[in-house]
């Protein structure tokens, strides 16, 4: 990094980071609690509803591959500012949404803005907080989960207060405006990576040739599949059990609040040791237990199952990125790897709401979808065994320019 002429203002920087993170899920998390109201206005099958989560996540996957290049060309601060503006405008456009296409297009545009931010922010964290990467990633991801909890819990009330679901969805543009103002205020504390770091960075093409990059991407994608599926379908699942939209939304908010807690606690636990595998296995066990509970006794102990899922998913998301960042020392290289990992991962995760929606349309039940996710999570425990820190250097060794030229 090119160092600033003055010491970075840590508190404003962390505050801005939190405000930015809060904006990365409301565009998706607000849909589920409002789904009944939306379907009363716009007739939608469950398969079509799944597109409201699938397509923005798919857009996130493709846009992730461009984030690092845009940041290298225009600068990290400017790129994130523009992405926040895109998210805010996409949310505001929902004020006039009257068709499924309107909702889908706004979700896709917001997803692209979200992807750009998520592809760039890990590199900023690694460069500005090199000795506290796990803790600050926990704070950042906690903010993301907190935004989801905030949207899930308050959107039905906002809709009742403002009169309809369109206003409830559009209201989240105000949060983007606040984050944009805070991000602009710390523009002097976000400096661009220097040429040496850029030259040493792995390019996307070389990452695609690294099996470990794909393993990390697949692991992230399978874990995120649980998140996207729960985000899209947990409220409708409990509405079918006889719950109101408001109560189902509050359950999702509770789940995401547990994600917030786990997003802080699990990275803090993992930061004590270079080997993150024990904590990864712990959160995967929590995810599996939560899905098994939804299958066997969804109505008897909903708070327990939602809590277990929240703890597991909330810890798995940041830990997956932390493990990826552990493989790289240079901030830009770490940022490029996490962008690649998230790009691959979101392309995988985008399919889970669609698959669950299709299962629901065919079988009239979400049970098979929860079972599939439990099996996938169990399979991930075997992947965790390969994340041994001593093996990291050999997976991403960078050849020197002369050595590369001799080949």
What is each of the regions a protein language model found here?
Residues 62-101:
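Conserved MFS/SLC helix-loop-helix module at the cytosolic interface between two early adjacent transmembrane helices
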Residues 31-32, 211-263:
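Extracytoplasmic gate region of multi-pass secondary transporters
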Residues 63-75, 262-275:
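Helix-to-loop junctions at the C-terminal end of transmembrane segments
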Residues 102, 130-132, 138-191:
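Helix-loop-helix hairpin linking two adjacent transmembrane segments in secondary transporters
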Residues 43, 75, 96-101, 130, ...:
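Helix-breaking motifs and short loop linkers at transmembrane-helix boundaries and internal kinks
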Residues 116-129, 315-329:
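Intracellular juxtamembrane helix-capping segments at the cytosolic ends
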Residues 328-374:
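A late C-terminal transmembrane helix in Major Facilitator Superfamily
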